[in-house]
């Protein structure tokens, strides 16, 4: 069936004209344009009013993922639904949200059910899946951010589909509707994805509530999020989505596009929603800021450097060629820092070359300065990462 679906989408893509492809929001997220994609599925789509998984619908999502995986696209799933599933199993009122304790207990039980469901449905498509539980704080701490990024890279390189959810069983402030929108954007940032798709019960951002205003129009593309965009998504706007709905999605779009990642809001209320969106592009696309300043602002502007790494001319040239910084090219280290801190990278004339997140603390960095990769494990006494600063966690200045 996966092969048939792959054939179907290939044929439909070939039939599109060049003009339609250029104007189609969905084309931005196809494998040839988006090698790594994050999709977010909310509770209202995954779980019905009785607290049961919409398995038939979710199976079509699994088929979508499988055919795109077969086409070479790496996909990460951010999945809600644990609290709703756990609440039904425990017979708790108000969907498990009557109290913080109920929500945490529901999440603890529901996470197993959710993970089993994804593993079964993706397994039926010959795909392995993994479970990662995070809170937004995990991606704010730079050391944990590096670990999340490295884990995702390895899983995706092994052909695994990571399924990520908030760790609601221990989270407090994070337990509120919409957090997985922001989490999906953060995952897009940490995984260096090209795109994030938020599947929702609405098909995009509207100028007004389309259920009440016949003149409401969907905004197909947003190139810059400004006050008017936020006003349409606010809780007191005519769209009526509230702070837990469209407002969180627009905030997610701000996070994603700020980091150079395209984000789309589209409907999930149809079978094979991923395939359908790639075909018709029905939704709102928030376009990525692809300028260097966006990445500099994220890494260089918002964070304070905790140390300095001085490198030789060969390393300078290697960095300009897009390579990671290896210990062999380092001449000296200054400052006191921990793994995951931001450090400045300078040449021997003290010119600032780049800034990045370092993989070792200052003590270990000093020990391996100027050393070749094969020497690192013997020096430190443990199997360590090859790069001192990975190219994915570095911005040239």
Swiss-Prot record:
It comes from the Bacteria. Substrate binds at residues 80, 168, 180. It is an enzyme of class 2 (transferase). Its main location: cytoplasm. One of its GO terms (cellular component) is cytosol. Residues 306-383 form the PUA domain. Its EC number is 2.7.2.11. Residues 1-28 are annotated as: Disordered. One of its GO terms (biological process) is L-proline biosynthetic process. Coiled coil: none annotated. Keywords: Amino-acid biosynthesis, ATP-binding, Cytoplasm, Kinase, Nucleotide-binding, Proline biosynthesis, Transferase. It is found in: Cytoplasm. GO terms for molecular function: ATP binding; glutamate 5-kinase activity; RNA binding. Pathway: Amino-acid biosynthesis; L-proline biosynthesis; L-glutamate 5-semialdehyde from L-glutamate: step 1/2. The keyword Calcium does not apply. Pfam families: AA_kinase (PF00696), PUA (PF01472). CDD domains: AAK_G5K_ProB, PUA_G5K. ATP binds at residues 40, 200-201, 243-249. InterPro entries: AceGlu_kinase-like_sf, Asp/Glu/Uridylate_kinase, G5K_ProB, Glu/AcGlu_kinase, Glu_5kinase, Glu_5kinase/COase_Synthase, Glutamate_5-kinase_CS, PUA. PANTHER family: GLUTAMATE 5-KINASE, ISOPENTENYL PHOSPHATE KINASE. Belongs to the glutamate 5-kinase family. Catalyzes the transfer of a phosphate group to glutamate to form L-glutamate 5-phosphate. This is Glutamate 5-kinase. It comes from Zymomonas mobilis subsp. mobilis (strain ATCC 31821 / ZM4 / CP4). The lineage of its organism: Bacteria, Pseudomonadati, Pseudomonadota, Alphaproteobacteria, Sphingomonadales.
